[in-house]
Structures are given as structure tokens and as C-alpha cells.
């Protein structure tokens, strides 16, 4: 969905000698247009993403006329690329990372590799279920199914020590992809790889600890004296979990065009209202006294 997440993979493939193309889906990354449509139906947002993908595929295949072409998608995009590749027989392979899709068929699309992180047990189980649904008996990770001559290879495997996001930054993922292309093309492209994931992690940790350090230079305020019973705290949490879904199922305000963002905004507003009316009136003064606006502004900007 977002070009920034796919950068390590794209760089690794480019270093191996392949032309790579990254793009942002509607409503993702730097794409100027929002996505729209019902996210719970195939005919809604999914179909619009598929149409967008098909347009990009057609453009670049026509522009470069490659002898080999492959599409890669992660998470939500894994379903999109499987559907799109099934409609584009000129694609030689599709790679679904952290896959969750029901669109895969026995011979469509061509040559499919499914990769999940080791720490994604549900998606790993789902991927084996996908193979079962297309007629593979007792499927195993790391084993090839189908015939290369028929362009119907199917393989599910996992990336060691990786989760839903880490799988995109893992050097092992990069190596798997280069090895997969070499296998399909009977080629021997050299794998170089990159450690963008490690440097990204160092950057985030540095920003995190630097932020903690900078808060020490902000004005301090003494904490108020609160009297908040455990039972009240317990019931507020129960109400905040149960009530918002019941309200938002029947009534929501439209603040933005993004369905997921709009839902989160409504959810936060409802929870804030619940918390506001759950506080004892005598505590509002203490909350106001201890509110640290500079700290709030600093965290908000971050």
C-alpha cells in the first residue's frame, strides 16, 4: 500500500539487477487522492485498488516490454495483487507477503510465492489453508507444489524472526525473493541485500529516547491529588469497551473521506465523552491545575 514500506525490498531487487516500480494506493502514503468504497465487500474499495493496480501494470509493461515481470504485495495488498495478477497473464509471478486472500486458484495467477513472518501464526495457518482450498493435500511450509512448465508453482514459507512489519525489512525476505526469481528464470543474479530495517529501527529508537530527554527541559507542574476508586476505574473501562461499538454501529459523523480514519476519530470522541462524564466533578479542578500544555504540545507535534 505504501512505497516507504516496500523500499528495502525494491532496493534489494534493484541491486540484483531488476527494474523496480513502487506506488502508493489511493489513500496511502503520498497519493493525493483518498480511497473510497465499502472495505467489507470485494466490489467496494478492493475493486478500485485492483483497477488502479491494473492500470499501473499495463503502463509499465507497455513501456518496458520486460521478458520477466513479477508483482509483490504486503498484507491488504497481497489480496489485491493476487486478484490483479489473475487478470494479467503477462505477469510471470506474484509474491504475497503476510498474505490473507481467498482469490488464489490452482493455476491463476502464475507461479505464486507466499511469505509470512515467523511471528504471524494466524497468517501462516491461513496460507496453508489457501493451498488446501486449491487442492493441495496436507500442505507444508517450504515445499514446492505444482509444475513450473505449467507456470503453476505454489509455495508457502516463513521468514525467521520476523513479524507483520519486520518481514518487509528482513534481509531474509530479500534473499528469498531473489532466489525465487532465479529459480523461475533459471538465472543466477547475485544477491546483495541491505540493512535499511536495522538503520530504520536505530532511527526510531534514537528519536524516542531523544524525545524523553527533551521533555526534561519543559516546565514542570505538580500533580494534583486525585481520588479515583478502583471500582469506578474498572466500570469505566468496561463501558468504554462496550458502548462505543454499539453507538458507532448505528450513528457516526463524517469528518474525513477515509473510512478507517473516520471511524477512529468517532471512536476517540465517544471514548472521550464517556471519560469526561465518568470523572467526579471535584476532580476537574485538579486535572486543570496539573495539565501541562507545553508537554501536551510537544507530544502532539511528535
Q: Which residues fall in each region the model found?
A:
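Soluble extramembrane regions of membrane proteins in the secretory/endomembrane system
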Residues: 1-192
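Short juxtamembrane and helix-loop transition motifs at transmembrane-helix boundaries
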Residues: 74, 79, 222-228, 254-259
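Contiguous hydrophobic segments
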Residues: 153, 232-234, 248
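Alpha-helical transmembrane segments of integral membrane proteins, especially early/N-terminal helices
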Residues: 162, 168-171, 227-236, 299
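Membrane-embedded alpha-helical segments in integral membrane proteins
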Residues: 181-191, 214-217, 243-253
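Juxtamembrane/start-of-transmembrane alpha-helix segments at the extracytoplasmic/lumenal side
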Residues: 188-202
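Juxtamembrane interface at the cytosolic side of transmembrane helices
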Residues: 201-243
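Alpha-helical transmembrane segments of integral membrane proteins
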Residues: 238-302
Amino acid at each position: 500500500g505504501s512505497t516507504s514500506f516496500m523500499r528495502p525490498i525494491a532496493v534489494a531487487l534493484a541491486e540484483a539487477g531488476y527494474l523496480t516500480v513502487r506506488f502508493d494506493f489511493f489513500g496511502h502514503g503520498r497519493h493525493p487522492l483518498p480511497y473510497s468504497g465499502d472495505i467489507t465487500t470485494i466490489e467496494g474499495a478492493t475493486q478500485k485498488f485492483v483497477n488502479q493496480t491494473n492500470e499501473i501494470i499495463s503502463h509499465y509493461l507497455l513501456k518496458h516490454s520486460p521478458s520477466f515481470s513479477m508483482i509483490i504485495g504486503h498484507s491488504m495488498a497481497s489480496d489485491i495483487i493476487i486478484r490483479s495478477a489473475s487478470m494479467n497473464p503477462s505477469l510471470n509471478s506474484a509474491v504475497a507477503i503476510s498474505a490473507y486472500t481467498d482469490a488464489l486458484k490452482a493455476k491463476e495467477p502464475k507461479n505464486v510465492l507466499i511469505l509470512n513472518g515467523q511471528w504471524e501464526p494466524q497468517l501462516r495457518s491461513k496460507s496453508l489453508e489457501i493451498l488446501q482450498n486449491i487442492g493441495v493435500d496436507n500442505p507444508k511450509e517450504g515445499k514446492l507444489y505444482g509444475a513450473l512448465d505449467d507456470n503453476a508453482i505454489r509455495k508457502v514459507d516463513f521468514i525467521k524472526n520476523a513479524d507483520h512489519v519486520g518481514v518487509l525489512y528482513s534481509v531474509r525476505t530479500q534473499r528469498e525473493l531473489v532466489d525465487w526469481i532465479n529459480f523461475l528464470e533459471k538465472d543466477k543474479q547475485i544477491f546483495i541485500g541491505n540493512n535499511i530495517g536495522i538503520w530504520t529501527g536505530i532511527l526510531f529508537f534514537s528519536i524516542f529516547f531523544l524525545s524523553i530527554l527533551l521533555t526534561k527541559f519543559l516546565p514542570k507542574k505538580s500533580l494534583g491529588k486525585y481520588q479515583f476508586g478502583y471500582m469506578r476505574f474498572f466500570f469505566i473501562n468496561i463501558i468504554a469497551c462496550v458502548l462505543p461499538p454499539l453507538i458507532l454501529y448505528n450513528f457516526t459523523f463524517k469528518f474525513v473521506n477515509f473510512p478507517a480514519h473516520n471511524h477512529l476519530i468517532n471512536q476517540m470522541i465517544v471514548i472521550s465523552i464517556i471519560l469526561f462524564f465518568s470523572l467526579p466533578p471535584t476532580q476537574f479542578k485538579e486535572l486543570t491545575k496539573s495539565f501541562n500544555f507545553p508537554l501536551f504540545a510537544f507530544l502532539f507535534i511528535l
